[in-house]
């Protein structure tokens, strides 16, 4: 009798769960799209989900059903190439608390400096697909809208107070907050701001609270902040800085303007760098035209949109579609049909395969060595100065782009590193052994993962040693010598101006 009652109870619970599941999946289909997205995103606020549309509805009452199913993001990396998994990682949607290895070193070592290179956070597309409706994304910051952050309200308030700050060049004329109801092209979104508020909070817990890199008496000389001239990079850097140093004194902030996306400053004259970039672009073109499935996909998408295939390709549709994907917005529809998830998967898969071939051909690697040497040289020289006892620029922040970070990863020899996601961060730490005056070490971390021993300059270092750290000398030698030997040169100038024959 007892077993029978337990069976009936379990049966009733199963029925209730089934009813709730169906309600969660299908009740919101009668709501407006904007409310659908908000409802669905709040089902499990602490558990990131990706809403994949099963039947694409057409715009303007064309009558197709608009159902979605909930797919939990995988907790472990799938064994084979998975474009949706990779796209999820690229979106970097704020979710569960992130684990990181920043600041982890033997307890007897002292942290001397940290240099961080970031990619801006989530942004509105740089390109639109012709004859389609732009993604309906609001770039006005609203703390009550998800994703949000405990510091967001105070951050918004603090950004309106900085009349005394010093900003080079055109940076002073840029808005410090995204502020358009319908985002402008390339504008930072609220998601992008939150991503860097989270980055700053994480770095604060590690570097300020645990290692006391900057004390409460820090001054302008202890901080270095450089940004390109785009509002999305300036705003991303300010968001990270605010969470790192809440309610910072604007008088202590001096933002340097970098006109080049590769941060080459006064060393941008490099003909051979341009040559290898052109060769790499030629490789990309040849690889694309060999992909018959990709071409068929573009042809099909062009028919749906009603434009020539060449015009569709030129609009770089993956940029716009990634915005839809990352924000759980439906893909564009016209009277001829809808761009769907299969189109997206084909283009994203091609991107991933192109990255693999890029590594094999090594043209991009040669470009990367020359493109990144000025910035890596600045990074190494700052470490060497601090190792000698200087106390300036203990925390350096470069707010940049994917085209900044990607060649740095390549130049460092990080073969397994993924293409920089939104709000990606690359960190260089300098450590010192107080018991041995000349013992300085460097750690390299990418999105919280310790990749020091994946770099070409420290791959041969024994990780099983008592001190699993890479000597600073190895990094400085790499920058000052080894980068050029890979190019059959002895200096940056020679590498940039050598003849091909």
Swiss-Prot record:
Gene3D superfamilies per record: Phosphoglycerate mutase-like (3.40.50.1240)
Residues annotated as transmembrane: 7-27
Cytoplasmic side stretches: 1-6
EC nos: 3.1.3.-
Subcellular localization, as worded in the UniProt entry: Golgi apparatus membrane
Keyword terms: Glycoprotein, Golgi apparatus, Hydrolase, Membrane, Signal-anchor, Transmembrane, Transmembrane helix
Residues carrying covalently attached carbohydrate according to the record: 328, 377, 488
Its membrane topology: Single-pass type II membrane protein
Single Gene Ontology BP annotation: chondroitin sulfate proteoglycan biosynthetic process
SUPFAM superfamilies associated with the record: Phosphoglycerate mutase-like
Catalytic function, reaction form: 3-O-[beta-D-GlcA-(1->3)-beta-D-Gal-(1->3)-beta-D-Gal-(1->4)-beta-D-2-O-P-Xyl]-L-seryl-[protein] + H2O = 3-O-(beta-D-GlcA-(1->3)-beta-D-Gal-(1->3)-beta-D-Gal-(1->4)-beta-D-Xyl)-L-seryl-[protein] + phosphate
Secreted among keywords: no
One CC-aspect GO term: Golgi apparatus
Record-annotated active site: 120 (nucleophile), 402 (proton donor)
Residue numbers on the Lumenal membrane side: 28-501
A GO molecular-function descriptor: phosphatase activity
Similarity-based family: Belongs to the histidine acid phosphatase family.
Job description of the protein: Responsible for the 2-O-dephosphorylation of xylose in the glycosaminoglycan-protein linkage region of proteoglycans thereby regulating the amount of mature glycosaminoglycan (GAG) chains. Sulfated glycosaminoglycans (GAGs), including heparan sulfate and chondroitin sulfate, are synthesized on the so-called common GAG-protein linkage region (GlcUAbeta1-3Galbeta1-3Galbeta1-4Xylbeta1-O-Ser) of core proteins, which is formed by the stepwise addition of monosaccharide residues by the respective specific glycosyltransferases.
Protein name: 2-phosphoxylose phosphatase 1
């Amino acid at each position: 009798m007892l077993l029978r009652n337990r069976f009936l109870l379990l049966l009733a619970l199963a029925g209730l769960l089934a009813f709730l599941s169906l309600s969660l999946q299908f009740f919101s289909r009668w709501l407006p799209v904007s409310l659908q997205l908000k409802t669905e995103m709040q089902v499990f606020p602490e558990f990131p989900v990706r809403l994949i549309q099963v039947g694409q509805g057409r715009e303007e009452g064309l009558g197709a059903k608009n159902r979605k199913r909930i797919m939990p993001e995988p907790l472990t990396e799938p064994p084979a190439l998975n474009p949706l998994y990779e796209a999820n990682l690229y979106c970097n949607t704020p979710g569960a608390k992130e684990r990181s290895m920043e600041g982890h070193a033997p307890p007897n070592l002292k942290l001397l400096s940290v240099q961080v290179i970031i990619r801006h956070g989530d942004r509105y597309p740089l390109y639109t697909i012709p004859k389609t409706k732009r993604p309906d994304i609001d770039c006005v910051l609203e703390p009550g809208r998800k994703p949000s952050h405990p510091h967001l309200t105070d951050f918004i308030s603090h950004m309106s107070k900085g009349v005394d700050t010093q900003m080079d060049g055109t940076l002073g004329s840029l808005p410090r907050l995204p502020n358009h109801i319908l985002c402008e092209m390339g504008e930072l979104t609220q998601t992008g701001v939150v991503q860097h508020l989270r980055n700053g909070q994480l770095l604060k817990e590690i570097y300020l609270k645990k290692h006391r890199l900057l004390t409460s008496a820090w001054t302008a000389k202890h901080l270095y902040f450089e940004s390109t001239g785009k509002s999305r990079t300036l705003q991303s850097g300010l968001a990270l800085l605010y969470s790192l140093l809440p309610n910072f004194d604007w008088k202590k902030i001096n933002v340097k303007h970098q006109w080049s996306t590769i941060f080459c400053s006064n060393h941008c004259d490099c003909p051979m760098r341009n040559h290898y970039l052109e060769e790499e672009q030629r490789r990309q073109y040849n690889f694309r035209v060999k992909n018959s499935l990709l071409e068929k996909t573009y042809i099909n998408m062009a028919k749906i949109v009603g434009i020539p295939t060449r015009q569709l390709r030129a609009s770089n549709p993956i940029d716009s579609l990634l915005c839809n994907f990352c924000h759980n917005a439906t893909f564009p529809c016209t009277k001829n049909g809808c761009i769907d998830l299969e189109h997206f998967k084909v283009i994203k898969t091609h991107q991933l395969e192109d990255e693999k071939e890029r590594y094999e051909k090594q043209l991009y690697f040669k470009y990367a060595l020359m493109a990144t040497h000025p910035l890596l040289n600045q990074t190494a020289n700052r470490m060497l100065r601090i190792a000698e006892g200087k106390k300036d620029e203990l925390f350096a922040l470069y707010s940049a782009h994917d085209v900044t970070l990607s060649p740095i990863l390549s130049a460092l020899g990080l073969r397994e590193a993924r293409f920089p996601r939104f709000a990606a961060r690359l960190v260089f730490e300098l450590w010192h052994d107080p018991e041995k005056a000349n013992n300085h070490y460097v750690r390299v971390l990418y999105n919280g993962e310790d990749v020091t021993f994946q770099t070409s300059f420290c791959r041969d270092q024994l990780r099983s040693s008592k001190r699993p750290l890479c000597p600073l000398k190895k990094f400085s030698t790499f920058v000052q010598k080894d980068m050029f030997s890979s190019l059959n040169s002895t200096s940056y100038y020679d590498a940039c101006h050598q003849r091909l024959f």
